């Protein structure tokens, strides 16, 4: 019986080089037929430049994520917050500073989607968020109706995404949506580096999904947080991002959204109210 094709999708590295390297080491053992990069190489971690450099050197098929386009736009002088010098933006300021011309050019050149085609298997579509854009996540809060709307015009039966930082699957109107976990900053309570491995099933004519969880030396990324300058000016945003690394739970965006809904500043005083209200 012929060997069925396999491929891996890795995404949401988010400035965490030790996690990225651990996944690459695991892939060297697993040896899939192809490897694809699903975006969000930068931000949320202290090694954005190093992660982009590693990805660039690999030369693998890759797409962009919402954090990549966001930081690249700021590197080009666009979408700069009015309070850019505030410590809340320290992580982004430092990450943008790591985007050398070659790194920025690589990010600028990334497509939003990729068509995965391996001999002997049905094609799949790789996106970062959803087929409609990198900021729209397909996950637990995504209804069947929303999923069906997001898939309008998509020819592939299998759509693979990232962005939400936890693995998730759904079948809608004959389509198979698969979302991989995050390499650098998971939000499913598992602090290991995570990625997706796919194998074609010749009997069901579908892609089988395996979520891989790879241990790595977390002290290396914690040391990078301490040595990078991200925490030097008391940035609350940096502290929340570090907490996400330590807990594998989301903290930054819920606080951001809570403040926006109440027209409150992103300050420690607001965060104290946020924590008290959430319990």
Regions found by a protein language model. Name each.
Residues 51, 57-116, 122-123, 141-155:
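Active-site neighborhood of divalent metal-dependent phosphoester bond hydrolases
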Residues 128-172:
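Ligand/cofactor pocket segment of small-molecule handling proteins
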């Amino acid at each position: 019986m012929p060997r069925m094709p396999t491929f891996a999708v890795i995404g949401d590295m988010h400035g965490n080089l030790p996690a990225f390297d651990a996944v690459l080491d695991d892939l060297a053992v697993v040896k899939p037929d192809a490897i694809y990069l699903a975006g969000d190489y930068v931000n949320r971690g202290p090694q954005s430049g190093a992660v982009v450099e590693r990805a660039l050197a690999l030369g693998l098929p890759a797409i962009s994520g919402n954090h990549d386009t966001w930081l690249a736009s700021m590197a080009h002088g666009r979408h700069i917050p009015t309070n850019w010098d505030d410590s809340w933006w320290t992580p982004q300021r430092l990450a943008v500073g790591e985007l050398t011309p070659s790194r920025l050019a690589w990010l600028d050149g990334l497509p939003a989607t990729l068509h995965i085609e391996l001999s002997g298997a049905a094609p799949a579509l790789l996106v970062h968020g959803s087929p409609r854009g990198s900021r729209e996540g397909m996950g637990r809060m995504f209804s069947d109706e929303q999923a069906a709307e997001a898939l309008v015009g998509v020819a592939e039966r299998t759509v693979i995404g990232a962005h939400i930082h936890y693995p998730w699957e759904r079948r809608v109107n004959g389509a198979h949506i698969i979302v991989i976990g995050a390499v650098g900053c998971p939000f499913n309570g598992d602090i290991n580096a995570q990625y997706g491995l796919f194998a074609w099933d010749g009997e069901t004519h579908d892609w089988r999904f395996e979520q891989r969880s790879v241990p790595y030396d977390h002290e290396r990324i914690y040391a990078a947080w301490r040595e990078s300058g991200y925490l030097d000016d008391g940035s609350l945003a940096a502290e929340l991002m570090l907490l996400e690394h330590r807990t594998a739970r989301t903290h930054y965006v819920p606080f951001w959204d809570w403040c926006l809904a109440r027209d409150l500043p992103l300050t420690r005083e607001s965060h104290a109210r946020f924590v008290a209200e959430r319990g």
